Amino acid sequence: MAIDEQIPRVQRALIQSSTPGVLQFTETREVPKLLPDQVLVRVVAVALNPCDWKMPTNFPCPGAGVGADFSGTVVRVGDDVRPGKFDVKLGDRVAGAVHASNRLKPQDGTFAEYIAVRADALWRIPDGMDFHVAAAIGLCVVGTVGLAAFHERHLNLPGSPEQPVKPRAGGQPPWVLVYGGSTASGTMAIQILKLAGFRVVTTCSPANFALVESYGADKAFDYHSPNLGESIRAYTNNSLSFVMDIIASANSLRQCYASIGRAGGHYVGFELVPDELAGIRKAVRASWVLGIRLLGYEIALDRGYGSPPDPELGMWGRAWFKRTEDLVWGGKIRPHPIELDTESGFDGIVAGVERLKRGEVSGKKLVYLIR
């Protein structure tokens, strides 16, 4: 109870303003009350993602919290959070992510001093790992990559990080293309796919070839190349059948489709794939992924992004979050290169979100300490 008595009624936070895409600082945000299966986390560090500007810009919800990835300390637990039901306990250092800019749960958002998080939608930070490193791993990227790679609705890859795919006798592991390998999602995808036993070919600028190779990519191609798709198809001996498109633009989709071998295959994009583009090659099965669906909640978004509650996917997500904890504790995955700001706090977060929006960040994960 001593920890509870130190928790204020209101807090500092960033929220959506009445102007779409503009974040507003407040000192009177109510500290959230807990549901029985939630924990209250005092936030220490947050990591930025493209969704931190895309959601407030494209899905304005004035007053809603913003920010997804976080790390911090559990300072209060809900009535159902107890040993035998949940692994987390009071005082644990944890990391994870929430669905921010959420009109159904406007209190959610990690750019704050305190957040309420479901006790099975996070992972415990191992001893010796700094908060800013844990925040940079978070759950946005690793969750979306896991969903895209291994769920039956998407690539449904054979093998897993725990049980790598076994090639046929005398053969080589299958290829997977990660389009956009020098992004935070890209370097995480490369690591997880390599753990699962695959060969990985990726795209980025030549300046980032060494970066993606340091995370395990077998071959990198310049995404500016006019014959990119044909070059990848030739390099993979016309056998590529799995593609993860982090960029998910009309151009990247066409290049990905051109890379897939004659027999066709599976494509998953990290943005909504319009039907008119998805169907340009009949031998390719296309899907797109939204990481927040792993929480199993209703997604109240328009423009084709919304979805009803999905308990099955929520159960899959909870299992993946636990697998993420195991990967972190085993030293199997590491974050994207970190640009850490220890001083600027909420002002720095606002500036960082604007940098992401202007496309000024490359090869770095922006992380801020909450001061």
UniProtKB/Swiss-Prot annotation:
Entry's EC annotation: 1.-.-.-
Alphabetic keyword roster: NADP, Nucleotide-binding, Oxidoreductase
Pathway(s): Mycotoxin biosynthesis
RNA-binding keyword on record: no
Top EC class, one word: oxidoreductase
Swiss-Prot/TrEMBL catalytic activity: L-leucine + 8 malonyl-CoA + 4 S-adenosyl-L-methionine + ATP + 9 NADPH + 12 H(+) = (5S)-5-(2-methylpropyl)-3-[(2E,6R,8E,10E,12E)-6,8,10,12-tetramethyltetradeca-2,8,10,12-tetraenoyl]-2,5-dihydro-1H-pyrrol-2-one + AMP + 4 S-adenosyl-L-homocysteine + 8 CO2 + diphosphate + 9 NADP(+) + 8 CoA + 7 H2O
Binding residue positions for substrate: 140-147, 291-295
PANTHER family cross-referenced by the UniProt entry: HYPOTHETICAL OXIDOREDUCTASE (EUROFUNG) (PTHR45348), ZINC-TYPE ALCOHOL DEHYDROGENASE-LIKE PROTEIN C2E1P3.01 (PTHR45348:SF2)
Subunit annotation: Monomer.
Name of this protein: Trans-enoyl reductase mycC
Upper taxonomic lineage: Eukaryota, Fungi, Dikarya, Ascomycota, Pezizomycotina
